[in-house]
Swiss-Prot record:
The lineage of its organism: Eukaryota, Metazoa, Chordata, Craniata, Vertebrata. GO terms for molecular function: metal ion binding; ubiquinol-cytochrome-c reductase activity. It comes from Dactylomys dactylinus. One of its GO terms (cellular component) is respiratory chain complex III. It comes from the Eukaryota. The keyword Protease does not apply. Keywords: Electron transport, Heme, Iron, Membrane, Metal-binding, Mitochondrion, Mitochondrion inner membrane, Respiratory chain, Transmembrane, Transmembrane helix, Transport, Ubiquinone. This is Cytochrome b. InterPro entries: Cyt_b/b6_C, Cyt_b/b6_C_sf, Cyt_b/b6_N, Cytb/b6-like_sf, Cytochrome_b, Cytochrome_b_C_euk/bac, Cytochrome_b_N_euk/bac, Di-haem_cyt_TM.
Length: 379
């Protein structure tokens, strides 16, 4: 009799995806982030669902409903902070996952990579809308500033902004629709993740060497399931430490003040995971130029397959490109720091230089370095 996991129509799909899946024998801990992102997504959906049971999407009661969750609901504080800090963990893992893809040349799987970039956009949109829901000062003003950027679009901009707002300012209609979108998007993201995996399993995983590993494959279970569980335990430890010891470490104190349209906070800034893009936006004095640079700072990921000029796939054996990539990482950390600083000297200049370097490293230096390495290796 055939094993049920190999014959049952539904279980067969799970078997081919997570149990009998042939995986390269040499994938390192950098390949753990995919499963960690999946766990993060599940955690966010579960905690979000419980929060939605007590939250009210109305400008008069939104702030107090969040307070009520933290004070009166059984373990409401834990659910709320696990959700907020879970989002931070999500982005940490996302950035590691993308960095791994760039380092090891995983972007040569075009379909998987492009779906991944679309996933990044969807997660960013979800996180932005979620930040608006507590209806604190930074929620309100963040929503006002970011949605206002669309008014830079020629001709249709101002109408588009009012259409998104559902009125002439960020108000009740905006909050209600943001809650609706924040609720539905994670399920759309889940569907996109399935497509992401579908395309990945068409080609099989990349390996640190960047070479074809068809000659040496091992079953995903038990080798990589146990490895993923270890990663999940580390993640659970980090998230619990953050949630139980310093839940507000990554938040903004301004968001503990109820939204007030008549009082602007001194420094409007998004959550830490958007600061690098926010710094790029602010570094350009022109509004439309800033919006385009903001979009391009993430859309540039789509260009990686076209900019790959090296004869080798991975950076494992390319020390010069490795140095450049780590310079890019340092540059992104500088951009993140600048995004959280006020718009005054010397931060303006540092932000402009870091933004120029960001685009130069990716568009000019990395392809040039690849060609140079080809020459050095006489290829």
């Amino acid at each position: 009799m055939t094993n049920m996991r190999k014959s049952h129509p539904l279980i067969k799909i799970i078997n081919h995806s997570f149990i009998d899946l042939p995986a390269p024998s040499n994938i390192s801990a950098w390949w753990n982030f995919g499963s960690l992102l999946g766990v993060c997504l599940a955690l966010q959906i579960i905690t979000g669902l419980f929060l939605a049971m007590h939250y009210t999407a109305d400008t008069t009661t939104a702030f107090s409903s969040v307070t009520h969750i933290c004070r009166d609901v059984n373990y409401g504080w834990l659910i709320r902070y696990a959700h907020a800090n879970g989002a931070s963990m999500f982005f940490i893992f996302l950035y590691f996952h993308i960095g791994r893809g760039i380092y090891y040349g995983s972007y040569t799987f075009m379909e998987t990579w492009n779906i991944g970039v679309l996933l990044l956009f969807a997660v960013m949109a979800t996180a932005f809308m979620g930040y608006v829901l507590p209806w604190g000062q930074m929620s309100f003003w963040g929503a006002t500033v970011i949605t206002n950027l669309l008014s830079a679009i020629p001709y249709i901009g101002p109408t588009l902004v009012e259409w998104i707002w559902g009125g002439f300012s960020v108000d009740k209609a905006t909050l209600t629709r943001f809650f609706a979108f924040h609720f539905i998007l994670p399920f759309i993201i889940t569907a996109m993740v399935m497509i992401h995996l579908l395309f990945l399993h068409e080609t099989g995983s990349n390996x640190p060497s960047g070479l074809n590993s068809d000659x040496d494959k091992i079953p995903f279970h038990p080798y990589y399931t146990i490895k993923d569980i270890l990663g999940i335990l580390f993640m659970a430890l980090a998230l619990l430490m953050l949630t139980l010891f310093s839940p507000d470490l990554l938040g903004d104190p301004d968001n503990y003040t109820p939204a007030n349209p008549l009082n602007t906070p001194p420094h409007i800034k998004p959550e830490w995971y958007f600061l690098f893009a926010y710094a790029v936006l602010r570094s350009i004095p022109n509004k439309l130029g800033g919006v385009l640079a903001l979009a391009l700072s993430i859309l540039i990921l789509m260009l990686f397959p076209s900019l790959h000029l090296s004869k080798q796939r991975s950076m494992s054996f390319r020390p010069l490109s490795q140095c450049l990539l780590w310079i890019l990482v340092a540059n992104l950390i500088i951009l993140t720091w600048i995004g959280g600083q006020p718009v005054e000297p010397p931060f303006i200049t540092i932000g402009q230089l870091a933004s120029i370097s960001y685009f130069c490293i990716i568009l000019i230096l990395m392809p040039t370095m690849s060609l140079m390495e080809n020459k050095l290796l006489k290829w």
